[in-house]
Structures are given as structure tokens and as C-alpha cells.
UniProtKB/Swiss-Prot annotation:
Gene: MPS1
Gene3D superfamilies: Phosphorylase Kinase, domain 1, Transferase(Phosphotransferase) domain 1
Catalytic activity: L-threonyl-[protein] + ATP = O-phospho-L-threonyl-[protein] + ADP + H(+); L-seryl-[protein] + ATP = O-phospho-L-seryl-[protein] + ADP + H(+); L-tyrosyl-[protein] + ATP = O-phospho-L-tyrosyl-[protein] + ADP + H(+)
Protein name: Serine/threonine-protein kinase MPS1
Top-level taxonomy: Eukaryota, Viridiplantae, Streptophyta, Embryophyta, Tracheophyta
Compositional bias ranges of the Polar residues kind: 274-293
Annotated residues for binding of ATP: I406, G407, S408, G409, G410, S411, S412, E413, V414, K428
Catalytic site positions: D551 (proton acceptor)
Amino acid sequence: MDREDNLPVQPDKPPKSLVRPILNLETTSSSSSSSSSSPELLRHLQAAFKRHRPLSKMQTTSIGPRRSVAPQRQASRNTRLVTAEGQRSQDVVTLSQSLAANTLTQDTTNNLAITSVAGESASITQPTVSEHFNPSDRQMDFGKSAVTSLESNLDVQRKSQSLIGTSQDMEWDATNQAEASHLDACIGSKHQNLPSVDSEVSLKSEYKDSSSLAKIQGQLGEFPNFLNQPRTRCSAVGSSWATTTLIHSSSAPMLNATTHVSRSYVEADSNANPHAVQSQGNLPSCCPSSKVSNILHPNKDATASEMPASTNDPEVRVKETDTSKQQQITTGLEAPVGSSIYGSDGQANARLPEELHTSVSSQPQKSDKHEKVASSKGPSAPRKRNYDPDLFFKVNGKLYQRLGKIGSGGSSEVHKVISSDCTIYALKKIKLKGRDYATAYGFCQEIGYLKKLKGKTNIIQLIDYEVTDKTLLQEVLNGTMSNKDGRVKEDGFIYMVLEYGEIDLAHMLSQKWREIEGSDRTIDENWLRFYWQQILQAVNTIHEERIVHSDLKPANFLLVRGFLKLIDFGIAKAINSDTTNIQRDSQVGTLSYMSPEAFMCNESDENGNTIKCGRPSDIWSLGCILYQMVYGRTPFADYKTFWAKFKVITDPNHEITYNQLSNPWLIDLMKKCLAWDRNQRWRIPELLQHPFLAPPIPHEPQVKTIKLFSLIAESCGSDDDKANSMISQLEQLLSNPAPLPRNDVLDSRDQNQQLLSRVSELCIQLQDRLQGLEGEN
């Protein structure tokens, strides 16, 4: 263009103290007045800047940055700008460029440059900081007083509202706090001839202005001193869109900490009064007609607690009201504006943080999606778990944290858990799906037995339980379950919270025999007697309750706080009141501990009676446990296969091998438990009175007699067979005299006299023997 040839020579590099030109709003002259400005006026302006400059991080009571929303009635005037107005704006740009060059050499020490441009055309000044435009800028409110004053000056209103909505042109107004406060003072007085500190930046993104603005970019350069003051950048697009940018003093010279918040005004009323925006980075609520869809915090370190308490909504949202407008603004801001205004000057471009470059059009889609998800949740939606099932079990509303798995088998698991009161328990989890109803019935029946045995010290205690299949549990407890042939099809679990035991009897025996192995030692009888008595007492407890366990083995006796307790009633059976035995439908138990009648259940014996299982079956299992405690193996451990075990156990002529022991009562006790005929087996009350547990106490006279004979035997010597024979005869006559042959002539008194005579003869003979030994010596 012709006007561009008359531009002054651009300096190589503008000084760092260069600031943007300040436009005098009340000047009506068409020529430049910057060169004729008096030094006194310059000092007044510097003093005004220092007076109204707020501290960057202190709370002040001074007037903050405010933005005046243009009345709706001015929109039609702004949209009817003609080509001549654009030409005059370009002239002003050229003139402003010339004045900026003159100002560079005028005063470098004051760090302030003033340029006054007069004319009817709108003034355009290059922005002080180069940055990538973001449509999410902060909106500012200038207040009611500023709106009233600005409306009185139509010329200023026309300059501040140079909007071209149909051609995607945008005008950006940048004002700092000092300029805003000074502008209110100047316009409020109206009659004072002080220069206004307000500056207007009108940037046109397309058409002829884009080339002129790109050239001004290189001339103005960086303004670090000017950036030390907080300032705002405002823009208005059309009649319903407005954006503002707050530039903190701490962000100079780059805009790394700037705040960009975009708002959409939906058909704003001409009398709308937007709320003031706080200058400390807090986001106020939007005007009543605005909706929320996007949030951008002013600072990375800002938190929700920093939001003002007066806000109605802690988040600033954007509602997508017009799709075509949104697409037009997004395109105009991201591509044409960014490229035409900032050009290719790398020094003037300030990169914003990547998290602040959020597309306006993408955020409403996320909020809409969130609303759809929220609306899809109805009363029928499953309730989300408030705990991690991999770390916790929930039984009847109580949480138990997993500590480790104790054991598992089939579809059952036993876990070590801890409750909320820091108590350790064992949690048994049984999966019901796929199991036959008979087994499921037995597991549910175990709960009933444990509830019945609650409070028994030698029976494991049930703390809590839950059966997910409530119908199955109710049928079992009521005894009305009829379908026992099929399998459970629904997903169901049984949770049982039990006492936690340190170790079971099987592991105790394994450790005990590992210590004895390789030595000549045998099992400690006191240790054996102590735990055998506890085993008998535990089984006696369930027998008194008419319950047959049917699966007694070392693993089902658990050591809890030093005492053995009976566990696992999964296949236990209750004995009817009118019988002493029970009849089973199938063989149950562990092979090495099963009784002969358990193998031959439902068969007939030699008398034609049906073989049933009962209390004697548990006695056989107890005999196998005692045999393992004494010898370290079961009675039929040498038979490996099922059929080999079945053959020897069901054979009444098979004799169990008992190795020689120091205590013959222990062998006798095992024989009383392992009698093949179930009617010959001792009952538990009798076993508790067996001499192994209750050895007989000898009478005092007998002890003295034995001691006397031992002294006589020592005096006679071990080589004197005749004397030892007489001593043995005397012991037998005194301890257990054999009855004499029956004689009808002699009565009992005569027989007793004969026994005494016999004792006397032996004593006389023994006395003579002792005297003969003394004569020989």
C-alpha cells in the first residue's frame, strides 16, 4: 500500500523499557501530539501510574480490573461498519507505527512512552505481549459506574465496540488495573483536561488489517517493564460472546501462568450487569443465563478451596448454544487470528501450557457424555461395591480383611482374616454352583450343628455366617429339602466365620515324629495322654447331642489357644431319638479312618440286619487316630489302593499288628477301640476310665509285703533258686490266693486255716534256709 512506504525506519531492536502507546480518548486533533508533549505532562502520567499500580500478590481495596459489556442497542451500529471505516483504521495503524518509532528515542530512562492519536476512526495499538490466542479468556466487569460514564461518550463507545461479527473480525481491548481506575477518574470528572490512561487494542484477524498488524509486531517487541503490572485483555465477538484474559505480574515476560476462561452469553439482555471478576485468580460465577461445561483454573496450584465463597457454583461452565457460532469462533481464534496477528516472529510468541490449550468445542461433549451416563443410572442399576473383593470379605454387612489362604480343596477355601476389632478369624468360603444338593445340604446342615453346639469349649465356635441362597438354607434348617438328586445351578456361596486355630493335630504329629525319627526315643506318654483325653472329650460332647461326626481324623482336630477342638461337621449326621445308629445313603469319610460298617453301609450282616453307622463308627476312627499317634502311621497304611484297604478292613479275621510297647495298657486301649465287632468296642465314657488315662492305685499293705519279700530275696541272693521259689509262693498266697479244691467236709473256715498253715510252712522253710546260709558263711 502507498501509506506503508511513508513509514519511518524501524529500529534494530526496541529497548526493554518500551511500552505500548497510550491513546488519549479526548484528543480530537488529527495529527500526532507525542512529539509536542510537555515534560510536565509526562511526569504527571508517570506519577499516576505509580499511584494506581497495585501490588501483585497483596489484597488491596483499590478498584480492580473491570469490563463494561456493550449495550445490546449498540450491536446494530457496530455491524454496519463500511469499508471506509476500515480504511481509516488502517491509516491510524500506520500513524501509530510512526509515532511508536519516534517514541523509542524520546525517553529511555522513564520506561514509558505516550502516543496520542486523534481522529474519528477507531484506534489500534499493538498488544504488549505476544501470545497464542486462546478462546478461553477471563471476562472482566467494569462496574455500573464505568458503564454509565462510557455511555455518555458516544465516540468512546464507538471506538471500544469495533466489532465485525459477520466477517470474523475481532477487537481486543487491553487494560491494567491502574489504567482502569484512572479511566474511571478521568471520565467521571468530564471537565478535567487530564490524559486518560486507558488503552485500547483493536486487532483485526483478517482482510487488510492483518498485514499491517504483523509489521507492528516487529516494531514493538517485548515490554517486560510494562508486564510487571497486572492487566486484562478483553474481546467481544458479535453481540453475545465476550472473552477476557488476565495477565498476572508474575507471568512476565512469558504468559505461562495466565488464566483463560471462556464464557458464553446466551441471548444476553441489554440491561445485564455481569459480576465483577476477582483479580487474584479466583473464578466467579457466570451471569444467571450462562451454563457451565468447561473449567480452567487460573493457576496450576489453585485448588477448590481457593474459590470465592460468594459464588453460586464453584465451577465456571460453558453451554454450547449455537453450533455454527461456536465453530466459527473456534476456527477464527485458533487458525486465522493466531497466524495473522503473531506472524512468524519467534521472539514475540509466548507458548501457553499445554493443559490450558483446551478446545471449547470438545468440553461440552464431555459434559454431555457425563450427563448421559448419570441419567442412565436408574433404580434397577446394580449398586457399586464400596470395598475391594480381592482384599475383603463381606459377611452380613461386616468386612473381614484377608490375611492369607490357609487351605483349599475342591470348591472350598479357608482364609485367615481380621475383623474391624482386630480379631483373627478363619473364614470358610464354599461355592455351591455345580455341587450336588446332598453335599450342599450337608454344608448348610453344618451351620445348624455349630449353632446347636455353640458355647461348647471343645467344639469350634461359629462367629458369623451367610448363605447367599436363602431358600436353600431355609429348606435345610426346616428339614423340608426334597430335591437331593440334581445339582445347584445358581451362583451361590456359603461364608462361615470361625475361630482361628494355630495348628491341627495332623501337623502336630508330623512335627513330633520328625523329631523322633532316627533315634531310639518313643512318643512321650504324658504328651499322648494329654491330647488323647481332649480328643475323647470333644467327641463325647457331640455324642451326647446325638450327633455322629463320621469323618474323624487328625486334621479335624484344631489347636485353639492350647486346647484341641473338633471342627468340620460337613458330613455329620444326627441320630434319631428312637435309634442308636444312623443309616447313610453312601460311603463317607476318609479311607484310612473309616470303620468296617462305613464300608458296608446298607448291607446285611450274618444275622440279616442292615448295617448302620453310629457312635461305634466314630470309636473305630478314634482307634485309628490313637494308633497313628503311637506308631506314626495308620493301621492300614501298608495297603495303598482302595480295594486293598477295603478287603482287609471288612475282613473280620484280619488281625491288626501291634508292636511291643513299654506300657501294656496302651496296647490294650487300642484293641478296645479297634475291635472289628462294633458291639465289642468300648464307649467313650469307658475309654475315659481306661487304666491308661486312670492307672490303678495299689493298696498300701501290698506295697509293704512286696518290699519285705524284696529284702529277703536280696539277703538270699539271686543264685538261690530255692529261696526265690518260696518267696514267689508267698507273694501269690498273700496277693491272690488260689482257691483250694472244693471239699464238702471242710467249710470255709477250715480252708482259711489250711491257707495260713501253708503260709506258715513256707515261712518256716524260708527261715531255715536263711539260717543255713549263715552257717555256711
